[in-house]
Each structure stands twice: as structure tokens, then as C-alpha cells.
């Protein structure tokens, strides 16, 4: 794709905004949910809210993998971290996610063996470097990450490694969107669909949105122009009544996605119900290792029982934020007891979390309150 000059970008933005204003009915409120944490950050960074008509409201959804990871999962991870014979391998943004009583960063400060890795395949190096230890990898993430972790599971299996285990809590995006619509707690007029996830799954898994719910949607890239283009696409669907799964990210996202990655996921995992933070159990929204790979499933190979109940942080409204029911600034803890330096909830921990984005980018010009 040709790289646009600054002037060309400005001209394109002007054209898109004129189109959006023409498609939006004055006085009408349209609530669009961006389902990807990267979109949330881009919307703030590029100041898109300030450019759109006042009636177009952008709300954040359950698009941050760290944020939607259930509290019980974190408590299990911490329980494994307490074992002397165990090394936890994890992505760095999991360190500060609060469990019921502690966090991985706090456990690490007390002597727990926790290694931050940048690619799942690093667990193989850890396995060989520490053959006397059990390596437990925190396998979280949406479809984008799942494909890479599948390759790691297969590599561990083929290498015959006996000390690598996966604590799995993968999440699938389409079932979560269905649950949000079924609950009908918050009015959603359209979805800005995630780009990276859609590279893997394609357009077809979102087909239920127009077919069953009559909800317009559009797959979007990640810069401001691509997001504006998706918003214009959704508004045009509403205007014409031709409700479809739009795709303004054609250069990357194919209709059927990545069949190789999909086949690998089907080979390694079975679909299962899974718990989402603040939302609860969503049917068919998770993955579990197939029986063929049960020896690498931490919960089956290294069973653990929690001796205390899992508790959400008192007062934290992360679950309501993830469902688009409230803005982060409407949580009573936001900017007070819950800040980027001292996060109470998972939505403030991850760089893709809605609360973290609001906190970083959402200051008003006065610097003391957050813009709504």
C-alpha cells in the first residue's frame, strides 16, 4: 500500500469526516463498540472522539486479553508460582494483574521464580536451562496469540519435553459479542471489529451479527484513517439498511481468514465454555487442550486446589467497563485509588486496557478531570 504524505492523510481524513457527518442524522445517538484494545488506544491517541459528531459515541468492549482473564485464573497462576519446583513463564503485562490476594509482581518480589518472555517458544529454552523445574506458561490471549501458542504446544510435544505445562485461558471473540447482544444491558448500534483477530478467523465467524441481530459491523485497521473508514462503513449500512460484515482492512483480512492457523488451532484445542472477568461464563468462548496434549495441561498434569475463594477487587467496575456499560471515568476508583502506578483492576494494568487508555490520554485541558 502506498504511504500517504501528511497532506494526503489530512485530505483523506477531511473526506471521511464529511462522509460521516453526511451519514449521521442530527440529534441521533449511535453507540459503536470497538472490540480491540489497540483500537481503543488509537482512538485516544489520534483524538478521534473530538473529530466525530457529538451523537456518535465510541465505547470500549472486551478486547483486551489481559483484562478479560478471570480472577480465578490469576489465583491459580499465583498458586503455581508459590511452588518451589515451578517457574512461571508469562508475558510482561500479566505481572501487575491483581489476583484476589496478590499479584505476580508481588510474588516475584517475595522470591517466586517468574520469567517474562516475549514469544511462547522461549519456554523450550527455559525447559532445557532448568530441567529440574516445571515450567508453567500462562497461555492467555485471543485468536491472534492462540495460533502462535499452538505451534509452541506442538513443538514441545515433538521435542518430548516433560517439564513444560500450559495454564490455558484462551478467549474467542465472536461468542463474547453474541453474549453482549443477548444480555441487552447496554445498547450497541454497531461493532468496530478487531483487525488482528480477523486476520486469523476472517469475516465469516461474524456472520451472525447481521443475520441474527441485524447489527452492522466492520473490520478495521489500526490507524486513525482506517478507524474512520470503518465508522463511515457502519453508518452507511445503517443508512441504506444493507447490514453486512464490512471490511475496510482488505489488504490484510481475507474472507476466510488464515486456514493454516485455524487448522492448527483445531488440531491442538477443543472449544469449551470459559469465564470472562466481570462477565461470567460465556458458552463456547474458550479453548482446552485436546486429550492428545493432556500431559502438557497444567490443570490436569499438576492439579491444584485453591484454599481461598477468588474475589474481585472491592469497588472495581472492570466488568462493567468491559461490557461497555460504563466509561472508565465512571468507576468510583478511577484516578483515585486506581491509577496506572497503582492499578486496582486489570483494565488499568494492560496498555490495551480501557482504563489505562483513558488514564493516559483522557485528561481534559485542565489536567484534573477526565473527558467523557
Describe each model-derived feature in a short phrase.
Residues 27-32, 163-164, 240-250, 276, ...:
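Flexible, glycine/charged-enriched surface loops at secondary-structure junctions
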Residues 129-139, 144-194, 200:
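Active-site histidine-anchored catalytic micro-motif
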Residues 229-320:
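Internal helical hairpin/lid segments
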Residues 185-254:
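A conserved active-site cap/scaffold subdomain adjacent to cofactor or substrate pockets
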Residues 6, 67, 138, 142, ...:
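Hydrophobic alpha-helical scaffolding
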Residues 57-60, 114, 159-166, 188-191, ...:
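Short hydrophobic/aromatic-enriched beta-strand-loop microsegments
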Residues 58-64, 164-171, 218-225, 248-251:
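A generic structural motif
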Residues 1-132, 146, 156-158, 167, ...:
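Metallocofactor- and cofactor-centric catalytic cores in central/energy metabolism, strongly enriched
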